[in-house]
């Protein structure tokens, strides 16, 4: 049985209605500050009227390469959108310091990404990855001299440190 065809705008509207007051993040695809700001404002204007629950998802660092000049454009975009009273969800947070920068810029939410670094290392070293790599039935194990981290410990530590920073400085960011 085939599902009905919907256009993207209709589909997003339905998600927003079903979610009611729950925040829904809509992601920008631009990678420059100016592009993310323009796209973020357009998404917010187009969709927030549906259920007043739209947050614009902005990456902390939209650069694809070290040589790109857009490393801080996410922070610039968050600051501009926050000034325009548009709530944001800052994504691709890999360090507590990035969470601090996002909060200082006015992000409504920060979203730490704990597993991406592990995934990158595993893929580059041709290590087989499946869901048991992150959620083994026995959790963390202690080998002869080293406590092996299956990704959960480092991930929870990142989240804990981000929360501590936000609380210690009384940011409204969640």
Residue ranges and their predicted role:
Residues 1-74, 78-80:
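Active-site beta->alpha loop and helix N-cap motifs at the rims of alpha/beta catalytic domains
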Residues 20-24, 50-54, 84-87, 106-108, ...:
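Short, well-ordered coil/turn segments that N-cap beta-strands
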Residues 64, 72-79, 87-174:
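Catalytic alpha/beta core domains of metabolic enzymes, predominantly
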């Amino acid at each position: 049985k085939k599902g009905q065809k919907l256009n993207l705008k209709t589909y997003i509207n339905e998600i927003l209605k079903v979610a009611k007051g729950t925040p829904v993040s809509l992601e920008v695809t631009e990678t420059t500050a100016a592009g993310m700001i323009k796209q973020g404002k357009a998404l917010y204007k187009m969709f927030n009227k549906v259920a007043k629950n739209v947050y614009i998802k902005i990456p902390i660092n939209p650069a694809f390469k070290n040589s790109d000049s857009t490393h801080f454009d996410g922070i610039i975009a968050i600051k501009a959108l926050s000034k325009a009273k548009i709530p944001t969800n800052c994504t691709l947070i890999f360090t507590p310091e990035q969470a601090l920068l996002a909060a200082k810029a006015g992000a409504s939410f920060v979203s730490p990404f704990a597993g991406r670094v592990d995934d990158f290392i595993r893929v580059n070293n041709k290590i087989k990855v499946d869901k048991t790599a992150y959620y083994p039935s026995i959790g963390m194990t202690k080998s002869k001299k080293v406590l092996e981290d299956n990704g959960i410990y480092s991930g929870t530590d990142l989240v804990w440190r981000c929360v501590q920073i936000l609380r210690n400085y009384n940011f409204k960011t969640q």
